[in-house]
Amino acid sequence: MEHSKLIQERAAKAFQVKEEDVKVLNRMLGGMSHLTYHIEIKGIEYTFRIIGKDGNLFVDRKTELKNLEIIKDLGLNNETVYFDVETGEKAAKFVPGVVLTTVDFHPHLKDVSDTLKKLHHSSLKPASDYGLIERLDLYETYTNIRSDKYLELKNNWIKLYNEEHKNMPKVFCHNDAQRSNMVIGENQIYLLDWEYAGWNEFYYDIASFGNVQFEDALELLDVYLGRKASLNEQNSVKFYRMFQALQWHQVALRKEMVGLSEVLHFDFKMLADKYLNLADRLYNEIKG
């Protein structure tokens, strides 16, 4: 079944309308694995998400829904109007705007910083901790692939975590604050896709911003702090980007295992290797 027809069918069921009442407008920019489409039903525009293959392995949908309810009053997200915790299918009010990946982000760094600070400085408590080490352990069970290089880097990361970060304060983090999850609206930047939200050190969200090019995260860090970051602060961002590289290494390996490279015409094995090399590079930079 073609994607637009599938979206039409699922959205009609979710909104309890006829399929012909669902107008499929276009696919949204963003993640490769999920299907997220811009649709219209009886004159109202929405986004509708269908989870891709294995997508629910990596996310607890009940926790995602709880966090969406918790952050609702902050006004950072588009309004969720339908959520199925079993399938992960979700509908939300459509927010007109420009995805940050499609424009030069530099003029918007202050707005990005303010958006993250609004979340980090809120008194809100997320539904769960991000569970860094436990998350890596879980993701490994989906691949059973732990190369010597991966295990060495993971152990080095855990050692650094226990020595320098384990007891640092945590805040409500989005945990996937990359530019593809940010939309420049008329009066604000919207932070979308809260699948991974939870307690974490604020540096984690800064690190996520460097998913295309790591140095972008260091630019955001200076704006966030309102001054030039110290070497230790820069290394904290590198530390969490190193974790993210190890995490996405395992996710990419899983996608390769289940045949998504062929389905999506993208080399996830190459991506997994790229993430592992990034983790190695960042660790060497931290150690100087």
Predicted regions and their residues:
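ATP-binding pocket architecture of kinase catalytic cores
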Residues: 26-131
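Conserved N-terminal boundary motif of the eukaryotic protein kinase catalytic domain
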Residues: 19-26
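Amphipathic, Lys/Arg-enriched alpha-helical patches that create a basic surface
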Residues: 269-288
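Active-site activation/catalytic loop segments of kinase-like enzymes and analogous catalytic loops
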Residues: 203-232, 242-261, 273-278
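An alpha-helical support segment within catalytic cores of ATP-dependent transferases
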Residues: 3-19, 122-175, 180, 185, ...
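Active-site acidic catalytic loop and adjacent metal/ATP-binding pocket
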Residues: 34-40, 47-48, 159-204
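Glycine-rich, phosphate-binding/catalytic loops in enzymes
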Residues: 64-65, 108, 189-190, 207-209
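Activation segment
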Residues: 53, 97, 189, 197-199, ...
